[in-house]
């Protein structure tokens, strides 16, 4: 079946509000000149979300606006955190959950990630659940085992029929310049579908879009576009410049 393709840019801790505005203007112009069939999304820092939302409305560009993180509670004494009502108010439509940097730098557990996935879905936004193995785990031959655990625990509180995306991001390939072989990525994506089928249904497994993330650049994006179970990309550094992000996205213009 034909699944919707997504190419999502994760800016991480980059770009001021003014830089974000200039970026969206550039990307909007590129998309107007050459519309793409894939859904292009940007997960910016919290400070730029409102400005980007306004730019999307002004330019008429079809861009999916996302956040890089959220707290599962709707309000409370959580210093430094952002809630779902706050994100919805500034036009956010999807949220990255379980990114490896949140897991490993900030110590987020599978249980906490599961609560975020559930809260994002209940708020009417789309959670993008990120999963992936470390180099040590891969070398030990335990990648499937770890990813299955992350998926089952991360989706534990989700109902069948709830909308979500999965992003496979091998930890050893994020920001390192190391790129996974297309055959390895295809294998993991097929395995992710098997786990989703086990957790929900075969129909859900066939419908769900699974993205790849890990040192994706213009010169290697094509290899993933040719994989039957890769439905898009989660792009880090290559998403920070509008032209390069656009060139990456063209590999999923089907």
UniProtKB/Swiss-Prot annotation:
One Pfam family matching this protein: TIM
Chain positions recorded as substrate binding sites: 10-12, 175, 215, 236-237
Keywords: Cytoplasm, Gluconeogenesis, Glycolysis, Isomerase
Family: Belongs to the triosephosphate isomerase family.
GO cellular component, one term: cytosol
SUPFAM superfamilies: Triosephosphate isomerase (TIM) (SSF51351)
Function: Involved in the gluconeogenesis. Catalyzes stereospecifically the conversion of dihydroxyacetone phosphate (DHAP) to D-glyceraldehyde-3-phosphate (G3P).
Catalytic activity: D-glyceraldehyde 3-phosphate = dihydroxyacetone phosphate
Presence of keyword Isomerase: yes
UniProt protein name: Triosephosphate isomerase
Subcellular location as annotated: Cytoplasm
Underlying gene: tpiA
Keyword Isomerase among record annotations: yes
């Amino acid at each position: 079946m034909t699944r919707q393709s997504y190419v999502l840019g994760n800016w991480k801790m980059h770009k001021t509000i003014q830089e974000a505005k200039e970026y969206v203007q550039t990307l909007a112009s590129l998309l107007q000149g050459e519309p793409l069939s894939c859904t292009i999304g940007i997960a910016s820092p919290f400070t730029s979300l409102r400005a980007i939302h306004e730019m999307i409305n002004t330019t008429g560009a079809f861009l999916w606006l996302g956040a890089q993180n959220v707290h599962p509670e709707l309000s409370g004494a959580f210093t430094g955190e952002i809630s779902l009502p706050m994100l919805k108010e500034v036009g956010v439509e999807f949220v990255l959950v379980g990114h490896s940097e949140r897991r490993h730098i900030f110590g987020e557990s599978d249980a906490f990630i599961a609560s975020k996935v559930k809260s994002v879905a209940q708020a009417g936004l789309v959670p993008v659940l990120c999963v992936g193995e470390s180099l040590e785990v891969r070398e030990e031959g335990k990648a499937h085992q770890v990813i299955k655990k992350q998926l089952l625990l991360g989706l534990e509180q989700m109902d069948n029929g709830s909308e979500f995306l999965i992003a496979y991001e091998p930890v050893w390939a994020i920001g390192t310049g190391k790129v996974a072989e297309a055959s390895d990525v295809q294998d993991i994506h097929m395995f992710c579908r098997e786990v989703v089928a086990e957790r929900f249904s075969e129909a859900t497994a066939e419908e769900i879009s699974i993205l790849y993330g890990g040192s994706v650049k213009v010169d290697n994006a094509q290899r993933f576009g040719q994989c039957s179970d890769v439905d898009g990309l989660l792009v880090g550094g290559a998403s920070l410049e509008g032209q390069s992000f656009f060139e990456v996205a063209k590999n999923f213009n089907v």
